[in-house]
């Protein structure tokens, strides 16, 4: 943090148990998320509330996630009233919501970020930081690059970039994406090995992939998340 002049936190994402969250809290993590969204609502609330009570005594913030199953390929959604009740009953500090941002890539499902639902949640919880998972946005050229080295991927029907960016004024303070990074990392390694098939030094092809990822993430901060150069607005 001091070397780069920006504030840094240590966060546990998608914690899978109360015990793991407590272990991270005891070992210097700034923030933890307990993901019990696949469990019955009452059990989700009970576990996240327990972590919140433990974490808050240590000055650590906690993220929770709530949603319910629905028919169709969207699979899960978060209703505004459900979000309000969950925050009141758990005391969580941030809330992950599912409003069209499904995990994974389904080439047959045209994703649409339901901005109006996020706006409705924000209206009920105007001070609550909202978290969006599974927000990878990429174009046809991105998939074409992967396919040129054997990915055999169809162009996914991702939601529009402008819809994602619209949520930034609706409480979305933390935006997670991983699928694009996974695809690019694998693509870069394949590209390098096709050009250098006799290379056996992992430092070479991993170094190339790491630089591709660095450039990609820097571009996302500037053009997708629009948070580049804003660290001075935060309290260190």
Question: In which residue ranges do the predicted regions lie?
Answer:
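Alpha/beta enzyme core
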Residues: 2-5, 14-129, 137-157, 161, ...
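C-terminal alpha-helical cap/extension of soluble enzyme domains
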Residues: 153, 159-236
């Amino acid at each position: 943090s001091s070397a780069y002049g920006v504030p840094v936190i240590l966060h546990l994402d998608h914690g899978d148990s109360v015990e793991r969250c407590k272990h991270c809290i005891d070992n210097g993590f700034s923030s933890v998320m307990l993901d019990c969204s696949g469990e019955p609502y009452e059990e989700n609330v009970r576990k996240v509330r327990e972590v919140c009570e433990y974490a808050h005594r240590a000055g650590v913030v906690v993220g929770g996630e709530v949603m319910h199953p629905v028919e169709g390929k969207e699979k899960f959604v978060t209703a505004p009233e459900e979000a309000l009740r969950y925050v009141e009953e758990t005391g969580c500090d941030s809330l992950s919501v599912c409003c069209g941002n499904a995990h994974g890539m389904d080439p047959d499902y045209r994703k649409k970020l339901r901005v109006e639902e996020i706006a409705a949640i924000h209206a009920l919880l105007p001070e609550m930081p909202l978290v969006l998972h599974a927000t990878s946005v990429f174009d046809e050229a991105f998939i074409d690059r992967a396919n040129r080295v054997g990915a055999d991927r169809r162009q996914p029907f991702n939601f529009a970039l402008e819809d994602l960016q619209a949520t930034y004024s609706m409480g979305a303070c933390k935006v997670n994406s991983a699928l694009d990074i996974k695809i690019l990392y694998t693509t870069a390694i394949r590209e390098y090995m096709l050009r250098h098939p006799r290379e056996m030094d992992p430092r070479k092809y991993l170094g190339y992939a790491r630089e591709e990822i660095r450039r990609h993430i820097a571009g996302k901060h500037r053009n997708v998340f629009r948070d580049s150069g804003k660290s001075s607005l935060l309290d260190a």
